[in-house]
Every structure is written in C-alpha cells, then in structure tokens.
Amino acid sequence: MSKKYVIALDQGTTSSRAIVFDHDANMVASSQREFGQIYPQPGWVEHDAMEIWASQSSTLIEALARADIHSEDVAAIGITNQRETTVIWDKMTGKPVYNAIVWQCRRSKAICDELKAQGLEEYVKDCTGLLLDPYFSGTKIKWILDNVEGVRERAEKGELLFGTIDTWLVWKLTEGKVHVTDPTNASRTLLFNIHQQAWDEKLLNALGIPRSLLPEVKPSSAIYGQTRIAGEGSSIAIAGIAGDQQSALFGQLCIDEGMAKNTYGTGCFLLMNTGTEAVKSQQGLLTTIAVGAKGEVNYALEGSVFMGGATIQWLRDELGLIRDAQDTEYFASKVENTNGVYLVPAFVGLGAPYWDPDARGALVGLTRGANRNHIIRAALEAIAYQSRDLLDAMSKDSGVELKQIKVDGGAVANDFLMQFQADITNVDVLRPELTETTAMGAAFLAGLAVGFWSSTAELKHKAGIERRFKPKINDAQRATLYDGWKEAVARTR
C-alpha cells in the first residue's frame, strides 16, 4: 500500500487540530492551534472564520511535517467539526460577510420566540428532531440576513453561501469548487427534514432563507473533492465528514442500535445509536442523525450540556483557582466530598433535558467551611451530574437501560471524574485506549470511502478499552447526592 496514512481535521470550539493516523489507527503525529473567542455582548459568541481557516490549514501542514510524510503518502482527509456554528460568505471573493456565530451564542432567542408564537414548535420537532433553541444554525442565519447591512439582498441574488464549519473548510480546501455538507451536520441546522433527508421548504420559508445559500448534502463517507496542501504536491481526496459528536460515536464504533458514548469537550454530549428508527424524545432530548456501519444514515438520541470542560476553563481563567485543567483531580481528591457545595454551570442557560435559556449559574450550599478544594470538586461533579440527567432521560425515551457507556474527550484523563461518573450513574464507564475518538471517527469515515480500510469489522480490533470504571457507592448515597443536585438546579431557574 503506497498510501499509508489518513488525516483527520478536527475543528473544535477553541482550537483546530490535524492528526495523522496509520493503518493500525495509531496516532502518528498531530498539530493544534488555538484561535480567538469573540464576546461582543453577554450571551453572544463569535469566531473569525478566516482565523479558523488559517489555524486549520497551518495544522495540516505542520502535522505532515511532524509525521515526516508528504501528500502522496496520504490516502484521504476526513473532517470533523464543531456543529451548528454558522458562516455566510461571498462565493466570488470567499470573504465572510460577518463573523461566524458560534453554537453557544444565544442572540437569536427572540427569533426562536417568534417561531414559537407562529405555532411552529411541534413541526420543528417532528421534522428536524430539534427544539426551537438559539443553539441551532437556522435562527443564526436569519439573524445575519436581518441584521448585517445588504446581506439579505445579496443572498436573494444568489451571491452568498452558507455553511457549518465542515462546509466552510471543504470550500476553502477545494479553492471554492465544492459546496457540500453531510447529513450529521445538516441535521443540526433546524432546516433539514431528517426523515426525508432533504432541506425543508416550510422551514426555509418561515425563516426567510433562500435555498441558494444551502450546500448539497452527501453521505458522511464519500469522496467530495480533492485538495492540494499549500497548493503543492499530489492531490488528496477529502472523503469523510461528520459533526464532532456523531464522529465520536462512529470513532467509538457505536454503530449498532443501543450503543452509547459520552464526549467530554467544551460541552458534554451523550449520544445513543437508535438504528434505523428515529425515536421522538419525550424527555427534552434531540433526535439526530448518526452514521451506520456502512456509512448509511442511522438515527440517534442526543443530550447536550453546554458547559462541560468550559466549566473547568472558568475555574482557571475567571476565578484563578487552578493553573491547569489537570490540577482539578489533585485538588478534588484532597477532600472527601464537596461539603454540601453544588456548582450549577448554567452560564449560558441550561441545555438538555431542561432547555432553559434564561437559567443562570449558581454556587449553592456555601458555608464558612467551604474552601477552594470543595468548589473545584463541585465543578467536576457538576459535569457528571449533568451527564446523569441526560442518561436518565435517554433511558426513559429509548426503553433501554444502559449497563455501560463509552467515554472520550479531554476530560476522560481525569480518573476522579470518571469514577464519580460511574458512581452517580450506576453504570460502568469504559475509557478507550485512544481517547481522540472524534478525530478517529473522521479518519475512519475517510479511510472507508477510499478503501484504506475495507469495513467497520476491520476496525473493531483497533478500538480497545484502556480502563473500566465500576460504581463504588451504594444506592442510598447515590440518591442523596443526586437529590442535592436537583435542588441546586431548581434554584437557577
């Protein structure tokens, strides 16, 4: 095999990464660059789309150099990305008309309220599997069309293009030749009928979004186009796309009905593959699109928590309680419990299963005896409590009581958090040998599309488990802790 590697581009909320994998799914080299976060007003979050592209393209060049390989050694590139984040650009100049509006941004709440007043809430849920929340792309697009001078007119003339970050990166990588997305990203726009797998005219009309803005939707594992790295060398196929959470689900090989994973990133995201059936949630979860064993469309239930690792960043950057995220395990382990302290990190509202954009964060149960260690421990426990909220909702919706859950993302290196997650949910928590499963999913999708790997069966032995965390507390202890959490959440609403 002359082409011995695949590359995953992992474009996240705070950084862009490129990771080189070999045929045994080993990580050969990687590169990472952070980029700026823009906060124009409270509750507003933006990125500079050109800075995202610059950071992502430079990591691609750097990862190749670190692996000491050339473009002719690479079979394919796969892309995984922060979902929902919205870019609109001029298709002639390639220049964005406004900063990218990030998934965390709440500015389009009034637009959501208007759509609710029009009686569209149930239609949106039935058609897209989503809720009318500022989280999703559709209302962000409308905000740009309505609030940036001249943009609506240009959009109606067909001069502009919309994309989530995957679409933006493919467009840049192919020098403006390919305007495409995949079903997992399309399913997060609030504009995509997940049953018919097509853009929905009724929702486009309701939001006043011209059809010409939207990309073509192609399978998650397919050849979309070719790119030359820095305009040089052999062309490489761009052959896999999946939104970050669906990519992690695929990277964990949760490709059969009833398999689930929890990703601990900026937010926390619990997904369960429900196979070919789209399960409508009664518990405030989302119905979304996942990727099946052969790259086909499957469905999943998803619970999203906005503040996971971002809570730890807050401890570091705003409170100065820690120097590094890794310090949290040391400080949390210095105390036996939180001394009754609960942190509810509703900094931008609450996600699933509450969906309360007006909730605000709270530190509850403080006494004179509360110290730094208790607060740090409460922050870690909050991540696990929020995941328990999601797990309970998912069990009720699916009728499946999970016995184990696969985990990935940066925070899974924290043994304290993983053990507390097992304790509070009463399920086994399985940590993989390779925790970069989001990037791995994109690499798998791209490699399968070009025949680098023959099937998902070939991949199964490449996804080993490093450690299994088993619950260590009893039911009474678990109930007392979780009741305290529910009381704390009630105080934020």
UniProtKB/Swiss-Prot annotation:
Pathway assigned in UniProt: Polyol metabolism; glycerol degradation via glycerol kinase pathway; sn-glycerol 3-phosphate from glycerol: step 1/1
Binding site for ATP: 13-15, 266, 309, 313, 410
GO molecular function terms noted in the UniProt entry: ATP binding; glycerol kinase activity
Recorded catalytic activity of this chain's protein: glycerol + ATP = sn-glycerol 3-phosphate + ADP + H(+)
GO CC terms: cytosol
One Pfam family it belongs to: FGGY_N
Annotated GO biological process: glycerol catabolic process; glycerol metabolic process; glycerol-3-phosphate metabolic process
Keyword Transferase tagged: yes
The enzyme's E.C. designation: 2.7.1.30
UniProt-annotated binding residues for sn-glycerol 3-phosphate: 13, 83-84, 135, 244
Record: residues binding ADP: 13, 17, 266, 309, 410, 414
Residues that coordinate or bind glycerol: 83-84, 135, 244-245
Regulation: Inhibited by fructose 1,6-bisphosphate (FBP).
Keywords: ATP-binding, Glycerol metabolism, Kinase, Nucleotide-binding, Transferase
Family indicated by similarity: Belongs to the FGGY kinase family.
Functional description taken from the UniProt entry: Key enzyme in the regulation of glycerol uptake and metabolism. Catalyzes the phosphorylation of glycerol to yield sn-glycerol 3-phosphate.
Protein name (record): Glycerol kinase
Organism per entry: Shewanella piezotolerans (strain WP3 / JCM 13877)
